């Protein structure tokens, strides 16, 4: 049993500035996982025991004992019923999907000695088989199949895959293209004052009565708005033509007279309709007097 002094020393070493936990794959399998399976308690408890499938990956960093960019957990292997013993890797908001086949891990001192297997999984948001791929990655380490030790516990390493600048630019371009397609596919509807829409007789027959009454009311209001506008334009054109004709005339009235005298015409009677009497009754013959004749000669 660890004493209080050992626990204080352990806590002090872990929290020392510059301390990092970056074990190799051989150390994870041959030391940490194997000792956990056989029940040997380690002096420094740096890897906690947690069922990570009860949490989403973005919540796991806060549940790990140590780690800044990589987080480690001992995880129980939960079997999924009715699927051939395949482990259940489903969370509340997504699922972990395996990529590729398992990779064998060997020791550096003896490359022929297999100490474990590594499975790589990627987290998808949504429900299988569909889902949105994320940048959360998990390496699941387990003991080899020929190992006589229990295999109900695995060691998982959680981290986020670094995204290159090229991939980020491609994502931004795709997002911009998608937004442009949405803008082109759904143009803004014109206002009611700019565009008038009238229903055909066939459409009016197929409309429900409340909807038809609403459409007819809107059309009537639109016509009431258009007619005064047309009358206003006509009055403006007439006024403009009147001003133009008034300003453009060259006729000047004599000084002291505001209007021209009326044109004097002879009065017509019934007997003036005769051609002969009309000639004798002309204004020139009426003024033909003896005095005028003497003046003429």
Swiss-Prot record:
Description of what induces expression: Induced by abscisic acid (ABA) and cycloheximide. Induced by tunicamycin, azetidine-2-carboxylate (AZC) and osmotic stress.
SUPFAM superfamilies in UniProt: NAC domain (SSF101941)
Biased composition (Low complexity): 189-201
Pfam families: NAM
DNA-binding region listed in the record: 115-167
GO MF term (any one): DNA binding
Spans annotated as Disordered: 178-204
Tissues of expression: Widely expressed.
Domain NAC per the UniProt entry, residue ranges: 15-161
Superkingdom classification of source: Eukaryota
Keywords carried by this UniProt record: DNA-binding, Nucleus, Stress response, Transcription, Transcription regulation
Any one GO BP annotation for this protein: regulation of DNA-templated transcription
Main subcellular location: nucleus
Annotated compartments: Nucleus
PANTHER family reported in the protein's UniProt record: NAC DOMAIN-CONTAINING PROTEIN, PROTEIN CUP-SHAPED COTYLEDON 2-RELATED
Purpose: Involved in response to abiotic stresses and promotes cell death and hypersensitive-like responses. May act downstream of NRP-A and NRP-B in the endoplasmic reticulum (ER) stress and osmotic stress response that mediates cell death.
Name this polypeptide is given: NAC domain-containing protein 6
Gene: NAC6
């Amino acid at each position: 049993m660890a004493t209080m002094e050992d626990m204080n020393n352990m806590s002090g070493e872990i929290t020392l500035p510059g301390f990092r936990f970056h074990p190799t794959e051989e150390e994870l399998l041959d030391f940490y996982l194997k000792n956990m399976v056989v029940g040997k308690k380690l002096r420094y408890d740096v890897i906690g025991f947690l069922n990570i499938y009860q949490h989403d990956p973005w919540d796991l960093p806060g549940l790990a004992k140590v780690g800044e960019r990589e987080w480690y957990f001992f995880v129980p292997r939960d079997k999924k019923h009715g699927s051939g013993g395949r482990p259940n890797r489903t969370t509340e908001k997504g699922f972990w999907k395996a990529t590729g086949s398992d990779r064998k891990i060997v020791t550096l001192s003896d490359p022929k000695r297999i100490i474990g297997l590594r499975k790589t999984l990627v987290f998808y948001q949504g429900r299988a088989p569909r889902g949105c791929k994320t940048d959360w990655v998990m390496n699941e380490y387990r003991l080899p199949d020929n190992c006589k030790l229990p295999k109900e516990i695995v060691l998982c390493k959680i981290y986020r895959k670094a995204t290159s600048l090229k991939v980020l630019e491609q994502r931004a371009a795709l997002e911009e293209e998608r937004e442009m397609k949405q803008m082109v596919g759904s143009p803004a509807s014109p206002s009611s004052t700019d565009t008038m829409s009238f229903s055909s007789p066939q459409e009016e027959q197929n409309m429900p009565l409340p909807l038809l009454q609403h459409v007819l009311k809107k059309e009537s209001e639109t016509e009431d708005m258009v007619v005064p506008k047309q009358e206003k334009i006509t009055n403006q054109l007439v006024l403009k033509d009147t001003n133009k004709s008034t300003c453009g005339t060259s006729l000047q009235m004599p000084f002291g007279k505001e209007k021209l005298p009326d044109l004097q015409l002879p009065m017509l009677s019934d007997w003036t309709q005769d051609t002969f009497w009309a000639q004798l009754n002309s204004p020139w013959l009426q003024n033909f007097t003896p005095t005028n004749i003497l003046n003429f000669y």
